[in-house]
Curated annotation (Swiss-Prot):
Its EC number is 3.4.21.62. This is Subtilisin Savinase. Binds 2 calcium ions per subunit. GO terms for molecular function: metal ion binding; serine-type endopeptidase activity. CDD domains: Peptidases_S8_Subtilisin_subset. Its cofactor is Ca(2+). Ca(2+) 1 binds at residues 2, 40, 73, 75, 77, 79. It comes from the Bacteria. Belongs to the peptidase S8 family. Transmembrane segments: none annotated. It holds the Pfam family Peptidase_S8. Disulfide bonds: none annotated.
């Protein structure tokens, strides 16, 4: 049987699905550790920019988990994603260790821009700024990609890069009580929050796992962006980002929560 993870319900994705909005026709690049073949995922393509790891299969688990939150299929098994009909692309920029280079991430963003991706999910970050990475975010944005990035997990009162760059949509994490997760980095530049604690999703080996992190929050927003793009195909990435913020459910302090909790129901009304 299929179960609906708490975060999928909390962001009110099923209400959008009931309107026929499932992310159909929307291309989402997952810049991560790759995505493993899985019965609950439909991977349309991708590329690897990790030296020595030419396959887009996931040797870590992180990318497969992120992908399921975006687009786990609406079928009779496993879990359900925010945008189950979105087109997933596995863009490997992190190796099996879970880490990667700025140059790999920049190449992944360039691939997203070159290949007509509507959304790029970057559940990754660094405390250090990089001119190369900032330029890659800006370039992808100028080519129509909505770059969605994790705020970081150090709990600090400033957010990671590339999330902190103006053209990246920075996502923090909340728990089941709609409180900021203790690890979720916050501060200037935080755009929005989403569920990031005890998030159940797909995992390599045709299995499932529960993970914590702003990495898990970010794909809820990438998925919601896909729903909005399907409903409003002419909208730009900037319009989609602003709409997700304007329709978010306020949770109080913008320093801690940005515009609030992403709300797929309100965003697809």
């Amino acid at each position: 049987a299929q179960s609906v993870p708490w975060g999928i319900s909390r962001v009110q994705a099923p209400a959008a699905h009931n309107r026929g909005l499932t992310g159909s026709g929307v291309k989402v690049a997952v810049l991560d550790t790759g995505i493993s073949t899985h019965p609950d995922l439909n991977i349309r393509g991708g590329a690897s920019f990790v030296p020595g790891e030419p396959s887009t299969q996931d040797g870590n688990g992180h990318g497969t988990h992120v992908a399921g939150t975006i687009a786990a299929l609406n079928n009779s098994i496993g879990v359900l994603g925010v945008a189950p009909s979105a087109e997933l692309y596995a863009v490997k920029v992190l190796g099996a260790s879970g880490s990667g280079s700025v140059s790999s991430i920049a190449q992944g963003l360039e691939w997203a821009g070159n290949n007509g991706m509507h959304v790029a999910n970057l559940s990754l970050g660094s405390p250090s700024p990089s001119a190369t990475l900032e330029q890659a975010v800006n370039s992808a944005t100028s080519r129509g990609v909505l770059v969605v990035a994790a705020s970081g997990n150090s709990g600090a009162g400033s957010i990671s890069y590339p999330a902190r760059y103006a053209n990246a949509m920075a996502v923090g994490a909340t728990d089941q009580n709609n409180n900021r997760a203790s690890f979720s980095q916050y501060g200037a530049g935080l755009d929005i929050v989403a569920p990031g604690v005890n998030v159940q999703s797909t995992y390599p080996g045709s299995t499932y796992a529960s993970l914590n992190g702003t990495s898990m929050a970010t794909p809820h927003v990438a998925g919601a962006a896909a729903l909005v793009k399907q409903k409003n195909p002419s909208w730009s990435n900037v319009q989609i980002r602003n709409h997700l913020k304007n329709t978010a459910t306020s949770l109080g302090s913008t320093n801690l929560y940005g515009s609030g909790l992403v709300n797929a129901e309100a965003a697809t009304r």
